[in-house]
């Protein structure tokens, strides 16, 4: 008995449909979104690496001003020092190595109890701190992408960016960021540039390049060897037409 061609086509499509239903959940499971960003490394000295069982299984060197994701493992060598600010709740942690910690939504936990004794100092930052700090990794990435070989690069359409006048919402947010900076700066050690970073993140959101230049230079006075801040300064100066050729 021969099967009619239309029946063969029907069964072929049916098999493909069933196979797709079986494979679709597996494909979705294999395409999980990356873990959420939960914090920012604001200070780092010595050797430290990070990895994540979900998205970054191979350890890589940690960097200052690098964002931290939920589930990140951070391993600090002997003598290493690392500070993290968590966006939710404004928790600031200062860790001393050797230690291995795991980042959670509002803070870190030591991988083992033996590394948690006398290894961390905790402070709580102003509630306004998280908004500006969240923008810092993207801002620094812009600065790096806008430079090549240490020379400011501009596309033909960019030209000089003048500081713009923000709308009412922007003016309110900038005013709050300035007030938070003044309070925060008075309570922070001189070499800590976290208050400057928070203000820079807000100013960048509204293209306040002239004020950004002053804030970056202030931060560089506190950390003159910080290469990320040097890159950011040249990027801002490029926006103002002051790039060194």
Residue ranges and their predicted role:
Residues 209-210:
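TPR-repeat structural position
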Residues 198-203, 233:
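Structural register within alpha-helical repeat arrays
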Residues 31-189, 196:
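Flexible, surface-exposed loop/linker segments and immediately adjacent secondary-structure boundaries
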Residues 236-245:
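Alpha-helical linker/edge segments of TPR/alpha-solenoid repeat scaffolds
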Residues 180, 184, 202, 218-220:
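Alpha-helical solenoid scaffolds that mediate protein-protein interactions
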Residues 12-25:
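Bacterial N-terminal signal peptides
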